[in-house]
Curated annotation (Swiss-Prot):
Pfam families given in the database record: LacAB_rpiB (PF02502)
The protein, known as: Galactose-6-phosphate isomerase subunit LacB
Involved pathway(s): Carbohydrate metabolism; D-galactose 6-phosphate degradation; D-tagatose 6-phosphate from D-galactose 6-phosphate: step 1/1
Catalytic activity: aldehydo-D-galactose 6-phosphate = keto-D-tagatose 6-phosphate
Encoding gene per record: lacB
Entry keywords, A to Z: Isomerase, Lactose metabolism
Complex formation: Heteromultimeric protein consisting of LacA and LacB.
GO terms, biological process: D-allose catabolic process; galactose catabolic process; lactose catabolic process via tagatose-6-phosphate; pentose-phosphate shunt, non-oxidative branch
Native source species: Streptococcus pyogenes serotype M5 (strain Manfredo)
UniProt GO molecular function: galactose-6-phosphate isomerase activity; ribose-5-phosphate isomerase activity
Amino acid sequence: MKIAIGCDHIVTNEKMAVSDFLKSKGYDVIDCGTYDHTRTHYPIFGKKVGEAVVNGQADLGVCICGTGVGINNAVNKVPGIRSALVRDMTTALYAKEELNANVIGFGGKITGELLMCDIIDAFIKAEYKETEENKKLIAKIAHLETHHANQEDPDFFTEFLEKWDRGEYHD
């Protein structure tokens, strides 16, 4: 399995630790940068990770910046990417199993290296649970990537809201 990884200058050390961990587990790592502590901008590296995943160069991606918010927002702008900013195992597993997330994002100054490694390992091993409901939700999310006339429709999510009101979703 190939994992693309990218970060900004604030968390280069953390990225390298995660990269070393992944290599020790036998994964091929595609390092999308940055490679040092020279000031740079996280959108560049979020985009590179996202493109590596959607182009098939990588199976999954990992994005890390100081808080994780910026780089995760950037990678999610790449059409076909479903990235989740996570700080715990439960969120990471939900993202993969229910939403078929293909990138995972972290705040390298928020979440410690060891916890990041544990979460990433579980994320990689988790499998998407394909159900009709999950497929519909993912299709709705994907539909937002391009402009469609019915996207402006105030009833765009009505089907899901009605199911929520009927108690069909459980938190």
